[in-house]
Regions:
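Core catalytic region of metal-dependent phosphoesterases/phosphodiesterases
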Residues: 57-141
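Short, charged, surface-exposed secondary-structure boundary motifs
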Residues: 84-86, 142-144, 160-161, 206-212, ...
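Binuclear metal-dependent hydrolase catalytic cores centered on His/Asp/Glu-rich metal-binding motifs
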Residues: 123-131, 142-179, 185-187, 242-243
């Protein structure tokens, strides 16, 4: 009996330690850097983007944002799940405030964003001059240059309309695509002229055991001739724990092949 109690106590202790490690991991802040070389940007000034998705219940770390500010980003792309049900609106507002202090913010909805009052969420976005994209595009100006940024609404909520989002793009010019769910890759065509696509949603599986998890780890690659980035995201869902899939944000430099650092 004493032996059984000892084993159970050891297991409980190990579980508590593991939970503490997973909680600490989930609350970390990591900034990853990437360079995407685009042929269409030959002769254009580089575009620097801070990308963050899946904030959920977290308050974005000010130290992380100070680190990001060193890169002087031209834009912030906010890839959905800024909020979820039960998150205080004051915290959502503070996150928006912190991001807009870094650079102009362009936002698309994620599935969890539909768990909060849309009227209140839109009011906060407008108050801080965030550009929300719902199956539409915007001409984004920076350093005397222009690119088109397309935003697709959430796929899981069946709010997406990819064709509407890319309706006014010119395949010969620089086109960026923002969509919370990476399943958007399936709707893309090479002829659409998308140069880079940014998504989150999967959390990199959030809790992984080696190679095994509910989703693949986030990463970069190419799809339909476009660069893609799928982020592990910044926050968590269901439980505030992570294992094998660190939270992450991203600083991406888009540049032409003529740039010396590309």
């Amino acid at each position: 009996m004493k032996l059984t109690a000892g084993i159970l106590g050891s297991l409980a202790g190990a579980a508590a330690v593991m939970a503490a490690v997973m909680y600490k991991t989930a609350n970390g802040s990591h900034l990853k850097t990437h360079t995407f070389t685009l042929d269409k940007m030959k002769g254009m000034k580089p575009l620097t983007i801070f990308f963050i998705s899946d904030v959920h219940r977290r308050l974005i770390d000010e130290k992380l944002l100070r680190e990001a500010a060193v890169y002087k980003p031209d834009a912030v792309l906010l890839g959905g799940d800024l909020a979820e049900g039960g998150v205080p609106y004051a915290r959502i507002e503070e996150n928006i405030k912190r991001l807009t202090a870094l650079a102009p913010v362009i936002y698309v909805w994620g599935n969890n964003d539909y768990e909060v009052s849309q009227q209140k969420l839109l009011s906060l976005l407008r108050a801080y001059k965030v550009i929300p994209l719902r199956n539409e595009s915007v001409q984004f100006a920076y350093k005397g240059e222009n690119v088109t940024i397309c935003g697709v609404d959430d796929i899981r909520m069946m709010m997406d309309d990819y064709e509407a989002a890319i309706r006014y793009t010119d395949a010969d010019k620089v086109n960026l695509l923002l969509c919370h769910n990476p399943d958007i890759h399936e709707q893309m065509r090479e002829s659409d002229g998308i140069d880079a696509v940014f998504s989150g949603h999967t959390h990199g599986g959030q809790i992984r055991f080696g190679r095994f998890g509910p989703y693949e780890l986030g990463g970069t690659g190419t799809v339909k001739k476009a660069h893609y980035l799928i982020s592990n995201g910044y926050g968590t869902t269901k439980v505030p724990l992570r294992l094998g899939a660190k939270p992450e944000t991203h600083m991406i430099t888009l540049c032409g092949p003529d740039e010396p650092f590309s």
